[in-house]
Regions:
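Interfacial aromatic "cap" segments that immediately flank transmembrane helices
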Residues: 18-41, 73-99, 125-176, 202-212
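Selective recognition of hydrophobic, aromatic-rich stretches within alpha-helical transmembrane segments
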Residues: 41-64, 105-144, 175-211
Length: 212
């Protein structure tokens, strides 16, 4: 696969379950990063933030065809900063639903639950769109503009829904790691989120949003 200009649309075939599930295990570098990422989770929340930053770097390399896609977590400062920005974005996206849920609970306003739940579902649905475009183009506006993320998710159409199906399946499978004395979940959860990063980087059209 040749390198491509970031201004060119990347029309990727929808990823399959098999390729998506195997991608985080496909190379020695990938397996090394998975093991390191899982071990990092022992130092929460820093480990979780590092994994998030690492995942965004991998998404960038997938789009720009910069193999090997898995190049470790160094420099740690860069990876941590990128993860912190993405963590802030998650908080921004989920804030409206969490505020409504808190008010509903504290003041016993049942009607607010009918606002909080849809807002939570919508925010969760569009987050991968925003994260993917931020990762691919270093466009930080997607981290604080849920409306732009929604536009990308909508643009993704059925491919975006297909990516969600694979992603949710991987997340559910990751809970099998709890059977390995619980500690296995550290590694299966990292595997699942590596799958998530891969499927959304493949499924979205990834058209550079210049002037939009």
């Amino acid at each position: 696969m040749s390198s491509r200009s970031s201004s060119v649309t990347h029309e990727a075939a929808p990823p399959t379950f098999k390729e998506s599930f195997l991608f985080p295990l496909s190379t020695p570098n990938a397996r090394r990063d998975l093991i390191f990422g899982g071990t990092c989770l022992l130092i929460l929340p820093i480990g979780w933030i590092l994994n998030l930053g690492h995942r965004l770097d991998v998404v960038y390399r997938i789009y720009h065809d910069q193999a090997p896609y898995y190049q470790g977590f160094k420099p740690y400062g860069h990876t941590l900063l990128r993860g912190l920005k993405a963590t802030t974005a998650i908080c921004i996206y989920l804030a409206p639903s969490l505020i409504c849920a808190s008010l509903a609970h504290v003041h016993s306003i049942a009607a607010l639950w009918f606002v909080a739940v849809p807002l939570f579902v919508l925010a969760t649905y569009v987050l991968p769109g925003g994260m993917t475009y931020n990762a691919a183009f270093h466009d930080i506006s997607y981290l604080y503009r849920p409306d732009r993320a929604f536009a990308r998710a909508w643009e993704g159409g059925t491919d975006y829904l297909w990516a969600w199906l694979i992603a949710l399946s991987a997340i559910l499978i990751s809970f099998l790691g709890l059977l390995a004395l619980g500690i296995g979940f550290l590694y299966t959860s990292v595997w699942a989120w590596m799958v998530v990063g891969y499927v959304f980087s493949r499924a979205l059209s990834l058209r550079r949003p210049d002037g939009r």
